[in-house]
Amino acid sequence: MIKLNDFIEISNLYNKKYIVLDIETSGVSRINSKVLVVGILNSNGEFVQYAITDKNEEKTLLETISLLLKDKYIITFNGDIFDIPFIKSRMSYHGQKPFIEKSTFDIRKYLIKNKYITDIERFSLKELEIYHDIKRFEEFELDSDVEFYTFDEFKNENFEKVLLHNKYDVINTYYLLDLVNKIEKSKQIHLNDFTIKIDSITHDKNILEINGDISPEIMDYFVEGNNFSLSIVNSSFQLKLYILEGYLETGVLGFVHIHNYPLDFVDESPYNLRKDLIPVFVNRYYLGNIKNIVKTIFKDIIK
């Protein structure tokens, strides 16, 4: 087994210790495939790679990285589905006790969860690198160019290529944290000395539900009107808006919120509707309109 070290110039976006993880394997089977390469980037910029040079070294590799992953906050791209379960399954295969991480953050899962408030349409790492203008200097131009290799193919023909690909996967996963931060900032509402942070927006039939948190803490609160209800418990809020589905213009089907309370903002959608009709969803959420509705309702509570 070999170990490679490097240092990457990064800033600690979260002001806490974390690692960015990516693995390369010989296939998708957790029984018949092996972990070939593990890349780890620490929040202080230290980058380390472990790669097996013999078929029997996987067990040693897993023992080594288990110590690095235990009790850590692990950031991945699709790692909740692939990387972390794969590592743990291979550890169990070798009779090892799988590590227990502190927590995980899967960037791909996060972006899919928030897809209706962004204009992101494709969620492969390569497509997101293009979307967020992240560079990758290696011979693999497309995700499909990276095949699963047998150990002999990996060792004899593609060793350096796979190591480089893994390194860029790790580094560019880190760079996608900047996109995550931009999305999180777009969901914040500042009102007086308070910050209202939207966590999720969903709709079902005639109800648009918005969940989030308020800081600093405020007292519990509940109010219900003709077209909305708001519940605040332990500074977490749930706002339900009554919405209607209809054609906003010829061929454009969407949802609007009908308001009967004063609104002092301009509709950000391109549709010329009555002033009491605020578009909230057409293929994607109109986040600006939704934030303004939230802000208007909270103005009577946070003074």
Describe the residue ranges of each PLM region.
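DEDD superfamily 3′-5′ metal-dependent exonuclease/proofreading module
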Residues: M1-S33, N42-K303
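Short beta-strand scaffold segments in enzyme catalytic cores
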Residues: V38-I40
